Amino acid sequence: MAEKFIKHTGLVVPLDAANVDTDAIIPKQFLQKVTRTGFGAHLFNDWRFLDEKGQQPNPDFVLNFPQYQGASILLARENFGCGSSREHAPWALTDYGFKVVIAPSFADIFYGNSFNNQLLPVKLSDAEVDELFALVKANPGIHFDVDLEAQEVKVGEKTYRFTIDAFRRHCMMNGLDSIGLTLQHDDAIASYEAKQPAFMN
């Protein structure tokens, strides 16, 4: 089973860019592995580093700013995760330490892949995201409280509501990935298999 996601409080980093595609999130040259670990080192590689090997940090890229070290909530603009389909994108984000991405919209495939990997994609309106960017930029180091059960993001006294499909919400809150969902029906599967003719086993 995956880690359960019910509530999360974390440091927010603002990535003020629209249409961030999966090749920017994790460039294609780092996709050789099929395990989920190790991709965080190459997250936003072409933006985070000045050299191809990832040895020289780019001081002008927001993830390298000292005040955002340890951030676990990424604030972004519309159409986050667009481009080619690659599950490595949420792998890289979670391996780096992100638990939540907040944006006005997400590419459909990235959105689905995020839930499969316990990365919560939160959709808020353009106006709300604008407001959050202003808050983060005025208060570097600010933390957001994200409550999946209540479907709320709290920032100080202000609350922002979001909606998640009931099934996906259930899976995240119970730490259920596709394997976990299958194992929930282990008894029924075993019973069905026991009833099959011997030549089918």
From Swiss-Prot:
Its EC number is 4.2.1.33. The keyword Protease does not apply. It holds the Pfam family Aconitase_C. It catalyses: (2R,3S)-3-isopropylmalate = (2S)-2-isopropylmalate. Pathway: Amino-acid biosynthesis; L-leucine biosynthesis; L-leucine from 3-methyl-2-oxobutanoate: step 2/4. It is an enzyme of class 4 (lyase). InterPro entries: 3-IsopropMal_deHydase_ssu (IPR004431), Aconitase/3IPM_dehydase_swvl (IPR015928), AconitaseA/IPMdHydase_ssu_swvl (IPR000573), IPMI_Swivel (IPR033940), LeuD (IPR050075). Heterodimer of LeuC and LeuD. Catalyzes the isomerization between 2-isopropylmalate and 3-isopropylmalate, via the formation of 2-isopropylmaleate. Belongs to the LeuD family. LeuD type 1 subfamily. This is 3-isopropylmalate dehydratase small subunit. It comes from Escherichia fergusonii (strain ATCC 35469 / DSM 13698 / CCUG 18766 / IAM 14443 / JCM 21226 / LMG 7866 / NBRC 102419 / NCTC 12128 / CDC 0568-73). The gene is leuD.
